[in-house]
Amino acid sequence: VGSEMCIRDSKVEDLTKAQLVSIYTGETKNWSEVGGDDQAIVVIGREAGSGTRGAFEELLDIADACVYANELDSTGAVMAKVASTPGAIGYVSLDVVDDSVKALKLDGVDATEENIKAGNYALSRPFVMATKGEISEQKTEVQALFDYLSSDEGKALIKSVGLITVD
């Protein structure tokens, strides 16, 4: 699953990983420092304990170092806050990005399915399903779920909600 960096309105199209770290740790405070307008950066993120936040901070190696203006309890809330707040930046799952915000490139790379699968986009992580023991040792219903999600129909469903399948 990819995490997309989104902003409200700025000349900035692309950030480096180092710039993103600097923004989220509070070192960079104004968009003019990264090629944008002279406007304060408003850092939006998920609440402590969120899996999305944990993955984002882990991927950037900044766990417990972020300085947030707002910590919100859902991806939808992050999107809405970024869309309504001048100078805002936030991270959301790739499957929820819409036209209310502007998506940013990271190190010149768009968060596309192709780039994520190729390992070229830095803010991505796999979601995995796990069982205690082999799938063949599980209840029939569990085996059926794994079989379905691995089928063409299951993969189509996963893609239909904006997620990326493992081929």
Task: Outline where the language-model segments fall.
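Exported/periplasmic ABC-transporter solute-binding proteins
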Residues: 3, 8-167
